[in-house]
Amino acid sequence: NTVVNNIQKNKQTCNGFALGVIDSDKRQPSYIKEFKEIGHSEHIKLMKHDSKNHFFIMIEPAMDTLILSCAAEVGVNMEDYELASELKDFTKITKDVDSKKDTRFKRLFKDIKGSKEFVLFGNLLSYLKNHKYDYDEKELKDYFDI
């Protein structure tokens, strides 16, 4: 909810480009209702504001589930990274850790970057970064058809 509120109310992003990554929480701010879905995969939904250049990449149901799913897809054993393989225990670790600095997560992300959902996530981020104001909705939809 913090990400959504910051994008909606921040003067710098209010009328410019904004991209947020959010979990698919049960209770979303009302601002989300102003967005339409461009495409979705098993865990990733791309949404665009009706009239503004605002995008959300919504992770369903949450980032920890996506990470565990990607690890399973590429055959990564979470214990090799000293991380839990059960969602409840893994979520506890992710809530207590600054994953940007944690070498376990750096190694894990490096090893799961070839998973289908991580590739999609990276492609969406890269495309939107390079096409902030000249995106093509069909090109964005095509990323989900791979």
Task: For each feature predicted by the language model, list its residue ranges.
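Acidic, divalent-metal-binding catalytic cores of TOPRIM
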Residues: 1-146
